UniProtKB/Swiss-Prot annotation:
Cofactor(s) in the UniProt record: Mg(2+)
UniProt enzyme class: ligase
Location relative to the cell: Cytoplasm
Annotated Mg(2+) binding sites: 259
Lineage: Bacteria, Pseudomonadati, Pseudomonadota, Alphaproteobacteria, Hyphomonadales
Cellular compartments per GO CC: cytoplasm
Reaction equation(s) it catalyzes: tRNA(Phe) + L-phenylalanine + ATP = L-phenylalanyl-tRNA(Phe) + AMP + diphosphate + H(+)
Protein name as annotated: Phenylalanine--tRNA ligase alpha subunit
Species in which this protein is naturally found: Hyphomonas neptunium (strain ATCC 15444)
Gene Ontology biological-process annotations: phenylalanyl-tRNA aminoacylation
EC numbers for this chain: 6.1.1.20
Family: Belongs to the class-II aminoacyl-tRNA synthetase family. Phe-tRNA synthetase alpha subunit type 1 subfamily.
Cofactor details (free text): Binds 2 magnesium ions per tetramer.
Subunit structure: Tetramer of two alpha and two beta subunits.
Length: 358
């Protein structure tokens, strides 16, 4: 408890002392980033005994919430101060000539990659399925085998919407997996779907945004096994990155909704900011996958003794970064015409496996 109190005091002091947004973001990364102090304490919960988790969990969740709230409040103060300073110094020159009219538009890289992924999996027999961005707790968590108390159910990871009295609480979906649940409940196997869409998580830095794009896939049939999953994803990676030889590996991992679960890594090389998939001797994780958990199948009315399946999920924004060399996610959402002209694609060219993706 003393360690938690000391970390909180130090974190709050550092937040209060942050003189600008860059300094505040450095504090956020140091405390709440993947390798931050608070995140490290949260990660240690999984190694504790049930009694220790019961005692330490609420304290650590409260610590993370207080630090996160303090960062948000300080960010508002700093942003308002920066805006005031900008308004004092900026002037609009009304004598300037009007800007030239818009030229031909460009397809955003995210949409281009969506189309490329759909073309590849469409060639494998997948159809596209979609669902609502606002979900209830059952479809987003419970049906997918997320236990009560799982960190993803906390407010620092998920955007919860204020529920009307007597109404079921709603969330901005944290993944497109609820569409898999809805499809399994509405359709009978065999099922082979691709699920693209926007998802929402409470994070913001060079490689994470509060809203991002995800594609998931689901196959439910008789006799499906891990070999089918591996073959499907290896073929996808070769087609997407347009290379014939890709060395890959599947590392054991944990996801509540799959068992066994894995993360797929591919070998790559780096030359400055340029990344080449299929060369070099470094490993990079590109997606998560696994065999659909029997509990998820049962929740959706499918007998796991008769039908099996696999699922996978990947971040479209990150795949676009890797394939087309964009170093930062944040410009994706800034509507900068110069950025769009540089990284955009012709809207008249439709990707296809036979005709070429990009």
């Amino acid at each position: 408890m003393s360690d938690i109190t000391a970390i909180e005091q130090e974190a709050l002091a550092a937040i209060a002392a942050a003189a600008d947004l860059a300094a505040l973001d450095a504090v956020r990364v140091a405390e709440l980033g993947k390798k931050g102090r608070v995140s490290a304490l949260m990660g240690a919960l999984g190694k504790m005994s049930p009694d220790e988790r019961k005692a330490q969990g609420p304290q650590l969740n409260a610590l993370k919430t207080r630090v996160d709230d303090a960062i948000r409040l300080r960010k508002d103060v700093l942003e308002n101060a920066a805006l005031e300073a900008r308004l004092v110094t900026e002037r609009v020159d009304l004598t300037l000539p009007p800007a030239a009219g818009p030229g031909e538009g460009a397809l955003h890289p995210v949409m281009q990659v969506f189309e490329e992924i759909a073309a590849i999996f469409g060639d494998m027999g997948f159809t596209v399925a979609e669902g609502p961005d606002i979900e209830d707790d059952w479809h987003n968590f419970t049906a997918l085998n997320f236990p009560i108390g799982h960190p993803a159910r906390e407010t620092h990871d998920t955007f919860f919407m204020k529920a009307l009295e007597g109404d079921t609480p709603k969330v901005l979906r944290t993944h497109t997996s609820p569409v898999q649940v809805r499809t399994m409940m509405e359709e009978k196997p065999p099922i082979r779907i691709l699920v693209p869409g926007r998802v929402y998580r409470n994070d913001w830095d060079a490689t994470h945004t509060p809203m991002f794009h995800q594609v998931e896939g689901l196959v439910i049939e008789k006799g499906i096994h891990m070999g089918h999953l591996k073959g499907c994803l290896i073929d996808f990676v070769k087609a997407f990155f347009e290379v014939d030889n890709v060395e890959s590996r599947f590392r054991p991992h944990f996801f509540p909704f799959t068992e066994p679960s894995a993360e797929m890594d591919v070998k790559y090389s780096r030359n400055g900011d340029a990344i080449e998939i299929g060369a070099g001797d470094r490993w990079m994780e590109i997606l998560g996958c696994g065999m659909v958990h029997p509990n998820v199948l049962r929740n959706c009315g499918i007998d796991p003794a008769v039908h099996q399946g696999f699922a996978f999920g990947m971040g479209v924004d990150r795949l676009a970064m890797l394939k087309y060399g964009m170093p930062d996610l944040r410009p994706y959402f800034e509507a900068d015409p110069q950025w769009s002209r540089h990284y955009g694609f012709s809207p008249w060219l439709t990707p296809s496996v036979s005709g070429g993706l990009s």
